[in-house]
Regions:
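Membrane-interface helix/loop boundary segments of multi-pass membrane proteins
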Residues: 187-215, 221-226, 236-262, 294-301
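Transmembrane alpha-helix boundary signature
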Residues: 114-121, 146-162
């Protein structure tokens, strides 16, 4: 990543003592480290502790190790169902997301200890009015998804079927799916808008961002085929010119937007493995990831994004019973089905695969900026250094 401090310069040799004077006594600590030692230290450490690139690499390795260990334990405890990838029940979703969340939290906590940060809240969770932003995010997520469903129904691209649940089951499955999607929100936002967005912001520039995104696109070209990959390519290309202009103009806060370009593209990338995803759905995942980055910038934390993400998924999967990234849940309240042209209905991808989702995401972004954009949250730039203890 971009150097955070300049490499140390060789120190001048001390003057010889005058005749008749005793040479000053020096302790071992008075002697400077050999250049080789200081050079190695500079490679790994910057003014804010562990450099961003090494921090991200450590985080990725730890999260993979923790997820593997937890997955093995949960499987042995028979908490993950039959192991069928298409099994989409509230209990399986809850425990699967619990693995991801615990692995992410454990990895972030260990990296935080290495970086001497005071708590996990240092990663874009410290901002003002946290609970207000969280609950307003819940409202925004449900309202945005409802607007999308309403638009699809109005256009004749979605039909409502019978209500699938009744009595106590409505509350039972509603609560179970709410718990599962809260974990989804905490895991995915915790990974992308909290840890990665925070860490990349303190150590990235345009060329590093371009290199990361180029590597992601090369990986797709070499290993993954299908329609969905074009969503990643499209979003990566969309961010290229704005980020380059920010770079050449040396705009304040440029690193935040370079990081947002990277984390949002990666967010689209991880959704390619979902069942039934088309390129619109992948592009929409990256686009909503960018909206969540904007929410971090204008509210001062990721709490709005966590709430919005959880409520969007809950409304889509449980309340309306639509496919979520190609998966239809067991135990949903309403029943809906796509009708007509896949570009408008979303087909097997669900509402997120419809062109209408891009309009809804755009409106959500406009509303977010209109409501919060003129307010001044706690500075994210100062938050980069504040949590580090000496």
């Amino acid at each position: 990543m971009e150097p955070e401090i300049q490499p140390p310069q060789p120190e001048a040799l001390p003057a010889e003592p005058a005749a008749g004077e005793d040479a000053p006594t020096k302790s071992i600590s008075d002697f400077p480290d050999p250049w080789e030692t200081r050079g190695v230290r500079w490679v790994f450490l910057g003014s804010q502790g562990l450099r961003a690139g090494w921090s991200v690499a450590t985080f990725v390795i730890l999260i993979a190790l923790f997820a593997t260990a937890l997955g093995f334990a949960f499987f042995k405890l028979h908490l993950l169902g039959s192991g069928n990838k298409n099994e989409f029940t509230a209990s399986v979703a809850f425990f699967s997301e619990a693995i991801s969340f615990l692995a992410m939290a454990g990895a972030a906590a260990l990296v935080g200890l290495i970086e001497r940060r005071r708590s996990l809240l240092a990663y874009n969770l410290i901002g003002p009015r946290r609970m207000v932003h969280f609950f307003s995010g819940l409202v925004a997520g449900f309202a945005a998804l409802s607007a999308l469903i309403g638009g699809l129904a109005w256009g004749g691209w979605l039909h409502f079927g019978p209500i699938a649940l009744s009595g106590a089951e409505v509350f039972k499955f509603g609560a179970l799916w709410a718990a599962a999607f809260l974990l989804v929100g905490f895991f995915e936002e915790g990974t992308f808008r909290c840890y990665l967005q925070f860490t990349l912001t303190r150590g990235i520039n345009f060329w590093w961002a371009l290199g990361i995104i180029g590597a992601v696109c090369l990986e797709l070209v070499l290993t993954i085929k299908g329609n969905g990959v074009w969503g990643v390519y499209a979003f990566a290309l969309l961010g290229l010119l704005p980020c380059f202009l920010l770079h050449i103009r040396k705009a304040p806060g440029s690193a935040f937007w370079q990081a947002a370009w990277v984390t949002s593209t990666l967010f689209g990338f991880i959704h390619i493995s979902n069942n039934g995803e088309n390129w619109i759905g992948i592009f929409a995942a990256a686009a909503i990831g960018f909206v969540f980055c904007v929410s971090v910038r204008v509210t001062g934390s990721a709490w709005w994004a966590i709430g919005c993400h959880a409520a969007w998924d809950w409304a889509e999967t449980y309340f309306f019973g639509a496919a979520d990234s190609g998966n239809v849940a067991t135990g949903h309240y309403l029943t809906t089905s796509p009708v007509g042209n896949v570009l408008w209905s979303g087909g097997t991808d669900g509402p997120e695969g419809s062109l209408l989702v891009l309009a809804v995401i755009s409106l959500l972004l406009v509303a977010l900026v209109a409501i919060y954009g003129r307010k001044k949250p706690a500075s994210l730039d100062s938050a980069l250094t504040e949590p580090v203890s000496g």
